[in-house]
C-alpha cells in the first residue's frame, strides 16, 4: 500500500488548475491583446523563481463515487518569486475565469496575498485585471447576502498595513473595477497599459442605467483619463513595459521599512562637470528651461525614473542615483504654470514625500518655485488647502534633505522644498523672497509707480533694484545657505552629501 493514487490526484488537479479558464477563454484573452496571468507572472519574475501558493484551490465537481469530474480554479493566482534575485510576493486576478470577478477561493487568496507579503516583509506586486463582486455571486444560491461574520476584520486592514511596511506596486492590465480598482490605487506605484487597461468605479452598463448615457470603458476610465487625474502614476506602452517600470521602481526601494535601499556600483565619476549647466538657466527670468535636463546632467547617467508625470505638471517627482546611492527627486517644471504649485501638484508632492519618508529615501529638491498657483480656478481647486498639506508633509519629514536653489523660491509654497535641517545649496541664478518681483513690486510700490512720469520705466527701475536683494549672495554672506556653488559642481556636492547621510539613515532605522 502506498499513496500513489493520491499523488496522481494531485497531479491531475494541478493540470486542471494550470488550464485556467480553458483554451477558448485563453484564446479570447490573446485576441484582445492581453496576456494571461500566468504568462504575466513568468515575464515579470526571474526565470523559474515562481513558487505558487494554493495552486489547486478552487471549486470541484465529483461523480456519485466521489471521483473528480472537474475543477474550476480560484480566479486569483499568488505566490513568491524573485526580481533581480530579491524575494517578492505577486498576485492577481485571472480574467480567463469568470472575468476575474472573485469566486470563493479567489477571494480568500486575494486577501492572503497581502498577509503573506506582510508576514515575510517583502514587496507586494499586484497584476490587476478583473471586476469586483457580482449580484449573481453568493447571494444567488443562498437567497440573500448574509455578509461576513461579525468578528471578521475589514479586507482593507491588510491593504492599509502593507502601505505602512512594504513597497506595493500595482499594474492595471485590462478592465479593473470594484475591489481590484481600490487595491490598484492603494499602492505606492501604479502603472496601467495604454490601450488595454481601464480603471472603473462602475462599468458602461451601470453608468448607462444610472445616467442614460452610453460610454465605452476607455471613455470612462482609460489611461488618457487617469494619467491626468493621478489615479495612475505612469502609463505603459505594453504589458512588458509595465513590468519593466515596476522593476525600476522597486530597484530604488528597500525590501521593507526595516531596511535601507541598496547602493549599486557606479562608474560615473562624482567630479564629472557638465558645461551645459553653466548656461541652462536663461538670464531672462521669464524664459523657461528643461529641469529634467538638469536632473540628467547632475545625477548618475540613465538613472532617473519619473513618477506621475502628467498629474500636477508643475511638479516633477521620481527617483535617481548619485554615485550609486538612491535618492528621491522633487523639482519644479517651469514649462507649466512657470513651475508654480497647483492643487494637483501639491497633492502629488504630499504623497511623494510621505512615500520617501516611509522608506527612508533621502530627498533632493531642485527649486524653481514662484509660489502657489493663483487665480479663480486655483481658488476653486482648494490650492491653499492642498498646498499647506504639502508644506506640512515636508515639515514632518524625517529623511535627510538637500535643497538646491535653481531659480525662484517664493511664498508659502517655497517652504515645501526645504526639509528640516536640510543641506541647502544655491546656484548664482537663485532668487528668493516673500513674493516674486513681478507681483511684489507692483503691490508694494503701487502709488509710487502710478505717480511717476513714466510708470513702466519706474516699475522696471524698482524691479532691478529689488532684484539685487533677492540675489543668493546676501544669503550666502549671512550663512542662510550652506554654499553658493558653480552649477557644474552640483554633482560633486550632492554625491558627498549622499555619502555623509548614510550613517544618519542607518540610525533612523533604530527608531522604527
Q: What positions do the PLM features span?
A:
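Ligand-binding clefts of soluble mixed alpha/beta catalytic domains
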Residues: 1-512
Amino acid at each position: 500500500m502506498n499513496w500513489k493514487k493520491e499523488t496522481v490526484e494531485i497531479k491531475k488537479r494541478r493540470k486542471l488548475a494550470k488550464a485556467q479558464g480553458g483554451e477558448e477563454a485563453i484564446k479570447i484573452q490573446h485576441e484582445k491583446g492581453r496576456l494571461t496571468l500566468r504568462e504575466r507572472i513568468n515575464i515579470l519574475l526571474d526565470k523559474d523563481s515562481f513558487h505558487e501558493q494554493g495552486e489547486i484551490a478552487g471549486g470541484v465537481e465529483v461523480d456519485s463515487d466521489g471521483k473528480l469530474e472537474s475543477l474550476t480554479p480560484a480566479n486569483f493566482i499568488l505566490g513568491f518569486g524573485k526580481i533581480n534575485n530579491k524575494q517578492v510576493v505577486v498576485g492577481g486576478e485571472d480574467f480567463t475565469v469568470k472575468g476575474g470577478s472573485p469566486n470563493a477561493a479567489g477571494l480568500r487568496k486575494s486577501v492572503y496575498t497581502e498577509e503573506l507579503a506582510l508576514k515575510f516583509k517583502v514587496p507586494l506586486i499586484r497584476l490587476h485585471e478583473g471586476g469586483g463582486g457580482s449580484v449573481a455571486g453568493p447571494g444567488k444560491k443562498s437567497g440573500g447576502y448574509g455578509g461576513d461574520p461579525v468578528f471578521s476584520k475589514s479586507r482593507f486592514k491588510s491593504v492599509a498595513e502593507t502601505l505602512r511596511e512594504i513597497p506595493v506596486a500595482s499594474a492595471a492590465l485590462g478592465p479593473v473595477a470594484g475591489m481590484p480598482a481600490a487595491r490598484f490605487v492603494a499602492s505606492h506605484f501604479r502603472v496601467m497599459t495604454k490601450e488595454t487597461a481601464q480603471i472603473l468605479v462602475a462599468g458602461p452598463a451601470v453608468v448607462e442605467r444610472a445616467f442614460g448615457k452610453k460610454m465605452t470603458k476607455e471613455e470612462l476610465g482609460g489611461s488618457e483619463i487617469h494619467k491626468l487625474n493621478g489615479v495612475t502614476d505612469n502609463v505603459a506602452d505594453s504589458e512588458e513595459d509595465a513590468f519593466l517600470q515596476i522593476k525600476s521602481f522597486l530597484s530604488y526601494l528597500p525590501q521593507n521599512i526595516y531596511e535601507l535601499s541598496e547602493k549599486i556600483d557606479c562608474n560615473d565619476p562624482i567630479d564629472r562637470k557638465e558645461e551645459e549647466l553653466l548656461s541652462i538657466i536663461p538670464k531672462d527670468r521669464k524664459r523657461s528651461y528643461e529641469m529634467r535636463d538638469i536632473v540628467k546632467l547632475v545625477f548618475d547617467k540613465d538613472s532617473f525614473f519619473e513618477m506621475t508625470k502628467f498629474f500636477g505638471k508643475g511638479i516633477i517627482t521620481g527617483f535617481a542615483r548619485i554615485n550609486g546611492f538612491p535618492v528621491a527627486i522633487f523639482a519644479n517644471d517651469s514649462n507649466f504654470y512657470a513651475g508654480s504649485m497647483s492643487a494637483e501638484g501639491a497633492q502629488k508632492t504630499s504623497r511623494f514625500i510621505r512615500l520617501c519618508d516611509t522608506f527612508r529615501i533621502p530627498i533632493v529638491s531642485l527649486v524653481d518655485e514662484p509660489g502657489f498657483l493663483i487665480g479663480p480656478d486655483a481658488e476653486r481647486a482648494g490650492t491653499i488647502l492642498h498646498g499647506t498639506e504639502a508644506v506640512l508633509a515636508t515639515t514632518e519629514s524625517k529623511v535627510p534633505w538637500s535643497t538646491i536653489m535653481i531659480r525662484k523660491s517664493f511664498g508659502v509654497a517655497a517652504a515645501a522644498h526645504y526639509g528640516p535641517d536640510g543641506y541647502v545649496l544655491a546656484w548664482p541664478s537663485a532668487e528668493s523672497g516673500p513674493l516674486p518681483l513681478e507681483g511684489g513690486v507692483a503691490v508694494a510700490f503701487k502709488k509710487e509707480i502710478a505717480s511717476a512720469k513714466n510708470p513702466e520705466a519706474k516699475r522696471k527701475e524698482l524691479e532691478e533694484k529689488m532684484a539685487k536683494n533677492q540675489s543668493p549672495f546676501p544669503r550666502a554672506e549671512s550663512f542662510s545657505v550652506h554654499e553658493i556653488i558653480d552649477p557644474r559642481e552640483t554633482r560633486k556636492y550632492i554625491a558627498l552629501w549622499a555619502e555623509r547621510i548614510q550613517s544618519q539613515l542607518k540610525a533612523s532605522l533604530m527608531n522604527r
